[in-house]
Amino acid sequence: MTNIRRTERVLLGAVFAMEAGGSVIFALMGNLQDEFQFSDAGLGFIAAAGFMASFVMQILIAPYADRGHAKRLLIIGTTLAVVGNALFASGSSLIIFVLARLISGAASGLFLPPARALMASLDEEGVSERLGAMGGAALAGFVTGPVIGGFLVGPLGLRWPFVIFSIAALISLFIVSTQHLPTLPYSKDRQRLAFGLLKQRSVLVPILMLSSIALPVGMYDALWDRFLTDIGASDIVVGLSLAAYALPFVVLSRFGGRLADRRGKVKVSFISMLFVAPLTALYGWFTVPLIPILLGMIESCAQAAGAPAGQGLLAEGAPEGRASAAQGLAGACNQLLAAVVAILATWGYGQVSAPTLFTIAGACVLLMGSVAQVLARKLPQGRPA
């Protein structure tokens, strides 16, 4: 038990550091643009580079963790996190910043799937609880990175936040590389592309459920700032609203996972979706910023149960020797869906009213989640749910 707890703490700390170091750029992109005078399109190139690299790594490279290379991928991912932030700290051109973001995105894509698979494999009991804790640590890091970066850039200058997070990643690298980690169940079969796992219902169901509750995130990434500003929120209120949305998930995700382990992962993930869908539909109907913010906090509570439930279901449903591949596939699908939704939402916001747009999004959540629930009824008997 002691070794399990120690490994859990190492993985949680490393995930927090990885996500914090990867997200600090979001608070500093405007500063980089002002300092080095590149176009608005350059901001898009930097953001897109991270997404593309993470997506490719999760699909093509993360499955190698299932061949006995899980720790090696964690080490390589953490090393890339050091390099990515070091490049941001030393760079002075758009090309270097795009390369730095490409490396940082690859770091996350290499690290997270094997980390989730290892966390799930530590014990047959409490799978969703541990994955919930990891999700909470990841989101806490993602939110903390920009806050620390924004706080440090004034007194220390633009380069030092990246230097500090590069040092933090270096410390994480030392801890991960010296820690004894378990090995994932080994597969000697020839590995095919992870997309082939979608043919298996035990993988498709949790990915559909996870994608359904993750769908609104793509809208929030693209529209939350603009929507709240349009209904009268100040920049400070918008910033606080993001922290308010994240806080319930960070605090409750471990408990949500524990609930899923006890009450059933399919049941908890479906009930969570039934909360997320109407809450998503309601956002656009209010013109007082406080109400959407409060709805977001309620939705975050539902996400804190649904996400660990879906991830735990995926961990248990992945074929023997394909645990990391399945986790990478789920992460890649969520990223792809979020990108598509962000593009469509940005376009749709200028074409239809906010109530209509958010209602459509809520209906899509309900549709995807309902399809997953129907398919879940046909899962093989005896599979943990």
Please describe what each predicted stretch is.
Residues 56-92, 260-263:
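Conserved MFS/SLC helix-loop-helix module at the cytosolic interface between two early adjacent transmembrane helices
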Residues 5-51, 205, 214-231, 238:
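Helix-loop boundary and gating motifs at the non-cytosolic
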Residues 322-350:
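A late C-terminal transmembrane helix in Major Facilitator Superfamily
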Residues 72-86, 166, 267-281:
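Structural signature of the two symmetry-related core transmembrane helices
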Residues 84, 95-103, 290-298:
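Paired small-residue
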Residues 100-138:
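Cytoplasmic helix-loop-helix junction between adjacent transmembrane helices
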Residues 51-59, 142-143, 246-254, 338-339:
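Residue-level signature of mid-helix packing/kink "hotspots" within the transmembrane helices
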Residues 1-5, 180-207:
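Juxtamembrane intracellular "pre-TM" segments in multi-pass secondary transporters
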